[in-house]
């Protein structure tokens, strides 16, 4: 379990962000660290020939990834640790190739007044999953990631085209948006999630770098990334008292 300052799954509600307890399950491959101390500065030269194409898998689910209506969650993709057991990395940098995700979101009505007469109204709302690149990763003074509202202006903006707030455009950019408009008469429904985005192409290479100052902490958590972290934002907007529970698998292809 990571320390509090690297905790993920922050819930945005009524314009504020609150750190949630780290009880959510995040299944991923963990590599043992075995290395010589390296400088955090990197130069991509002939030494890169020792780097290999790899893939790291991560599941995001559990209590941390359950949202009540009109709330959002901010989290990050875990990068590989420095080590020899794949998936891992051999340098203080990796080349990001592509990110694939696949999973489900379950939308459920929350019954708050059992004495209501007549049929229940439809569950209507908008679910969004947004992949964002953070060019200069660093935690805020509160130890939290930027909330959905801070990054995009307001959660209601998920009904239209999302855009990064002008004050943060130099640091963040949107890489992929998955959005579903939901309208069902049932008390619950399941929606499939699937998508892919590329970071490197024939014209452009996207590199992520790591601090790796402490030999006991050469891992892939947000707090150890110094360049190009990948953030994920979930948002469920609805006028109906309800909740959204997500289970999403991420596969990150990289050269490391």
Swiss-Prot record:
Pfam families: Gemini_coat
Motif (Bipartite nuclear localization signal): 21-42
InterPro entries: Gemini_BR1, GV_A/BR1_coat
Cell location: Host nucleus; Host cytoplasm; Host cell membrane
Gene Ontology terms, MF aspect: single-stranded DNA binding; structural molecule activity
Family: Belongs to the begomovirus nuclear shuttle protein family.
UniProt subunit comment: Binds to single-stranded and double-stranded viral DNA. Interacts with the host nuclear shuttle interacting (NSI) protein. This interaction may allow NSP to recruit NSI monomers to the viral genome and thus regulate nuclear export of viral genome by NSP.
Stated name of the protein: Nuclear shuttle protein
Protein's organism: Tomato golden mosaic virus (strain Yellow vein) (TGMV)
């Amino acid at each position: 379990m990571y320390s509090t300052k690297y905790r993920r799954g922050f819930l945005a509600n009524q314009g504020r962000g609150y750190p949630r307890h780290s009880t959510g399950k995040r299944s991923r491959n963990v590599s043992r660290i075995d290395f010589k101390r390296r400088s955090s500065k990197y130069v991509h030269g002939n030494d890169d020939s020792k780097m290999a194409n790899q893939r790291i898998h991560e599941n995001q689910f559990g209590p941390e990834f359950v949202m009540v209506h009109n709330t959002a969650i901010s989290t990050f993709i875990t990068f590989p640790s420095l080590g020899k057991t794949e998936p891992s990395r051999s340098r203080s940098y990796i080349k990001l190739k592509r990110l694939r995700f696949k999973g489900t979101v379950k939308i459920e009505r929350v019954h708050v007044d059992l004495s209501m007469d007549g049929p229940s109204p439809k569950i209507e709302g908008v679910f969004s999953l947004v992949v964002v690149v953070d060019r200069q990763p660093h935690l805020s003074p509160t130890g939290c990631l930027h909330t959905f509202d801070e990054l995009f202006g307001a959660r209601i903006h998920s009904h239209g085209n999302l855009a990064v707030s002008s004050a943060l455009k130099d640091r963040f950019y949107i890489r992929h948006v998955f959005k579903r408009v939901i309208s069902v008469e049932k008390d619950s429904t399941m929606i499939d999630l699937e998508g892919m985005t590329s970071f490197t192409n024939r014209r452009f290479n996207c590199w992520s770098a790591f601090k790796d100052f402490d030999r006991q902490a050469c891992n892939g958590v947000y707090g150890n990334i110094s360049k190009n972290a990948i953030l994920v934002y979930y948002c469920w907007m609805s006028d109906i008292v309800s909740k959204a529970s997500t289970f999403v698998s991420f596969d990150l292809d990289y050269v490391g």
